[in-house]
Amino acid sequence: MTFPKSHLDLLEYTTRAYLFLATLMPDGSPQVTPVWFNTEDGLILINTNEGRVKDKNLKARPQVAMVIQDPSDPFRYIQIRGEVTEYTREKADAHINTLSLKYRGEPWSSQPDQRRIIFKIRPLHFDAH
């Protein structure tokens, strides 16, 4: 599934839009977190530390809902429903560094106790506003 052309600018590196990620807790209640993201080959990539709530939720229940909001107009956004297709530690440290450069303008400061992981999410439905 391809992103709506009207909202492709929200995916651009220079836009620095955040993605609000909704996952499901073990009891079925939602949990929402703002995250850094980028896209690759039509997939949405996020990065987290292993052991965090979203890491556990995504591994157990791969269905997600997301919103990417225009930083300059909060009423312009795209709602996405999708599912995790893959997660990997491979190149996760390099990926978080890329995201840190995008959002903070500086390299990521790795912590020795962190184990970064990339989640790849396939969009299944878009609703652009």
Give the predicted meaning of each segment:
Residues 1-19:
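Extreme N-terminal tail/first-helix region
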Residues 11-14, 57-58, 99, 121:
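A generic structural signal for nonpolar/aromatic side chains embedded in well-ordered alpha-helices
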Residues 16-50, 58, 64-68, 79:
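Short beta-strand segments
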Residues 27, 52, 125-127:
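Glycine-rich nucleotide phosphate-binding loop and flanking beta-alpha elements
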Residues 27-29, 70-74, 112-113:
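A short beta-turn/loop motif at secondary-structure boundaries
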Residues 52-54, 73:
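Short, surface-exposed beta-strand-loop junctions and turns on beta-sheet-rich folds
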